Amino acid sequence: SGSCTVKTCWMRLPTFRTVGNLLKERFDGASRVIYGNKGSNRASRADMRHLEPEDPAHKPHSPQDLVYFERSPNFCAANSKVGTAGTTGRACNNTSLGLDGCDLLCCGRGFRTLTERVTERCHCTF
């Protein structure tokens, strides 16, 4: 008689890196929204369609967009109410483009460069 072939398809999640990159991209493009005139004071699923861009020049958000109501606090300045110490006086890495880099960590205030010469015994043999 005959033979049959079975194909099995498996659904697979993308890698963690892929998901993280997508979320970061959406986070960078997030826009602030306000309730439109049609909305109520409390957010429900039905009210989400009444969210409008804070800036009328921006296009309305799509269901895939990230939106926010409140601005983040200024983490550059100390704020005891929020519990942040600010970044003034922190050491930074002048050559880094990361979170420890002076451009980001000093929040555009500028920074002082400290050059330090250290002499140590190296226990070298020649």
UniProtKB/Swiss-Prot annotation:
Gene Ontology BP annotations: canonical Wnt signaling pathway; cell fate commitment; neuron differentiation
GO function terms (MF aspect): cytokine activity; frizzled binding
Post-translational modification: Palmitoleoylation is required for efficient binding to frizzled receptors. Palmitoleoylation is necessary for proper trafficking to cell surface. Depalmitoleoylated by NOTUM, leading to inhibit Wnt signaling pathway.
Keywords associated with the record: Developmental protein, Disulfide bond, Extracellular matrix, Glycoprotein, Lipoprotein, Secreted, Wnt signaling pathway
Coiled-coil boundaries: none
Disulfide pairings: C92-C107
Function: Ligand for members of the frizzled family of seven transmembrane receptors. Probable developmental protein.
Family that this chain belongs to: Belongs to the Wnt family.
The name this protein goes by in its record: Protein Wnt-1
Gene that encodes it: WNT-1
